[in-house]
Amino acid sequence: MNKGKHHARSFHPPSVADVDQLKEHAGIAACKFVEDGMAIGLGTGSTVRFSIIEIARMINLEGIEIVGVPTSESTRRLAESLGIRLMSLEEVGKLNLTIDGAD
């Protein structure tokens, strides 16, 4: 081994496809906390989009019932288009869980 000689590791940022896949995994993983009967705050962003799609799948295939409270108009439109029942925060009163991202 050559002492004093450092081999620099090159850093390669993840590709857009890799980032999208990581966001999908994170969005789906967040849904592991979703339970039947919950009122769920639905955030906004590219990662939460995957969560909303997963929640719709859970409603349709697993038969869970939840109420979503969207944080934006775009989230409302997506959730409605996927058949997620929505209410306002005033109607729900208290959220059991909120799913949001950092983007």
Task: Please annotate each region the language model reported.
Residues 7-102:
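N-terminal active-site beta-alpha-beta segment that forms phosphate/nucleotide-binding
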Residues 2-6:
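N-terminal nucleotide-binding beta1-loop-alpha1 segment
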